[in-house]
Amino acid sequence: MSNAVFATFSLENRIILLRNITKLQFLKKCHHFFHGKDVYKRQQATLRIVKVFWGLDSSLAYKRHFPAINWLTSYSLYLDNLGKWFDAHVAGDWMKDRQKLMSLLQEEAELEEIVKMVGMDALSAHDRVKMEAARSIREDFLHQNSFHEIDTYSSLKKQYLMMKLVIGFYEKSLEALEQGTGIQGLLKMPVRERIGRFKYTPEDRLDQEYEDTGNDLNEQIANLKGKED
């Protein structure tokens, strides 16, 4: 714009024009910062400092799964150091059990692609148990209700016991399948609902509820062993 044209504007219009030009320059700089050719370098520099990445997932938020953090894309570079602390101060097999849960979630993601193409019935009994165990991890362990007076806080002890219950269901169900037990009976066990409610257990009742739930799991699987669908 020439100075002659600019001079014809009123003072108010000049101020508005200058303000808009300033905004455009600012937005251009912001766009270049977040989407420019050096954005990858800035991301990597940030990750080297914080060493943690939380992958927020809109699909989880749409399903009302909170916190809506994708467990497959998120990671922490502190895992090795923190793992030693968890094993020493919470339970000696904390990291081992954590790896079992992560493996189930990763395998679930692979099986979901098969289910989308040919349906759940095409999966083997072992894979169906794997899918159900992964669903329990997502809905019973990872999902948290911040508006619930008990579930809004979860101690490391409770998290550990929840892991043991989910893993117990998975491993004992696989053993039962090897002995000829039908898949439908295992999936319909009443104890599964009790495992899902464990996160609402008060801290002073954790040990007793864990023991009772474990006993129910053992008893119900024992009653099903060898029974076909």
Regions found by a protein language model. Give the residues of each.
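P-loop NTPase catalytic core
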Residues: 1-10, 14-24, 30, 36-37, ...
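C-terminal amphipathic alpha-helical interaction region
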Residues: 180-229
